[in-house]
From Swiss-Prot:
Cystine pairs: none
UniProt gene name: rpmC
Family designation: Belongs to the universal ribosomal protein uL29 family.
SUPFAM superfamilies given in the database record: Ribosomal protein L29 (L29p)
Entry keyword annotation includes Ribonucleoprotein: yes
GO molecular function: structural constituent of ribosome
Pfam families: Ribosomal_L29
One GO biological process term: translation
One GO cellular component, as annotated: cytosolic large ribosomal subunit
Matching Gene3D superfamilies: 1.10.287.310
Protein name: Large ribosomal subunit protein uL29
InterPro entries: Ribosomal_protein_uL29, Ribosomal_uL29, Ribosomal_uL29_sf
Keywords from the UniProt entry: Ribonucleoprotein, Ribosomal protein
């Protein structure tokens, strides 16, 4: 499974981005919990979740900065 591209997220609305951020944070928490209890079978999913979260937060900050300029 390749890392998600930022272009995949650009089409989402602001509300959907916020929802995705919350869902990704929850997913990352669950993955960390599995890692701590040694139940994580696919450790690369932690990296993917972090990457996805960074992309979504970047988009959110870019959109808020663009909204402030207007």
């Amino acid at each position: 499974m390749p890392l998600p591209k930022i272009d995949d997220w650009r089409e989402l609305s602001d509300e959907e981005i916020s929802e995705q951020i919350l869902a990704t944070k929850k997913e990352l928490f669950e993955l960390r919990l599995q890692k701590a209890t040694r139940q994580l079978e696919k450790p690369h999913l932690v990296r993917h979740a972090k990457h996805k979260l960074a992309q979504l937060m970047l988009l959110e900050s870019q959109r808020t900065a663009a909204a402030k300029e207007k």
